[in-house]
């Protein structure tokens, strides 16, 4: 597959909470699609090592959700740090999209970008400054045409790769039902 500036990079991260000032990244996954949202490749799915102290001090929602999904234990056992995750992810991206070309794509992607700025600035720098945030469409549809939302539901597993797949499927749904494309 050739490098193409029209390809889109989808990233999702799972964190220990919502605040990059105190919380950290537990997992990162990446998918590249073409401009028509066809999946071209799934990148590395990396659990990032965090100490027992960090994992034991997550908020209750994170303890329950990441414990149930197995992510807490994967993070505990992982030998991957943030720098390794960045290097592996960029190595993958370089095969599909040039630096600075793709907006960062995902659901509530501004949150992921905040964590990238703090913990993974080299990765954040790989993206165009724009975002394709599926949650923006969801919020607009909720207000302007809420009946459309009845046709789409997400499992909400809160594992990074599954969340990206759901985000892509959700954008495909909106493309068909809102934009009629």
UniProtKB/Swiss-Prot annotation:
Matching entries from CDD domains are given as: Orn (cd06135)
* InterPro entries on file: Exonuclease_RNaseT/DNA_pol3 (IPR013520), Oligoribonuclease (IPR022894), RNaseH-like_sf (IPR012337), RNaseH_sf (IPR036397)
Q: Which UniProt keyword terms apply here?
A: Cytoplasm, Exonuclease, Hydrolase, Nuclease
Q: What are the catalytic residues? A: 129
- Documented EC number(s): 3.1.15.-
The kind of enzyme this is, by top-level EC class, is hydrolase
Q: Which Gene3D superfamilies match?
A: Ribonuclease H-like superfamily/Ribonuclease H
Q: Could you provide one GO biological process annotation from this protein's UniProt record?
A: DNA metabolic process
Question: Gene Ontology terms, cellular component aspect?
Answer: cytoplasm
Q: Which HAMAP family match?
A: Oligoribonuclease
Q: Which family does it belong to?
A: Belongs to the oligoribonuclease family.
Descriptive protein name: Oligoribonuclease
């Amino acid at each position: 597959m050739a490098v193409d500036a029209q390809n889109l990079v989808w990233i999702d991260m799972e964190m220990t909470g919502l605040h990059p000032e105190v919380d950290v990244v537990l997992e990162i996954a990446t998918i590249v699609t073409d401009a028509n949202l066809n999946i071209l490749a799934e990148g590395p799915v990396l659990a990032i090592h965090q100490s027992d102290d960090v994992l034991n001090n997550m908020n209750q929602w994170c303890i329950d959700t990441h414990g149930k999904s197995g992510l807490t234990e994967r993070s505990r056992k992982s030998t991957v740090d943030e720098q390794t995750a960045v290097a592996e992810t960029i190595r993958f991206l370089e095969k599909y999209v040039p630096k600075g070309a793709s907006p960062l794509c995902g659901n509530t992607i501004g949150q992921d970008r905040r964590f990238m700025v703090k913990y993974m600035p080299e990765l954040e720098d790989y993206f165009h400054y724009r975002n394709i945030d599926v949650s923006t469409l969801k919020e607009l549809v909720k207000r302007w045409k809420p009946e459309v939302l009845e046709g789409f539901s997400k499992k909400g597993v809160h594992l990074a790769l599954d969340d990206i797949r759901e985000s892509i499927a959700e954008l495909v749904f909106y493309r068909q039902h809102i934009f009629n494309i």
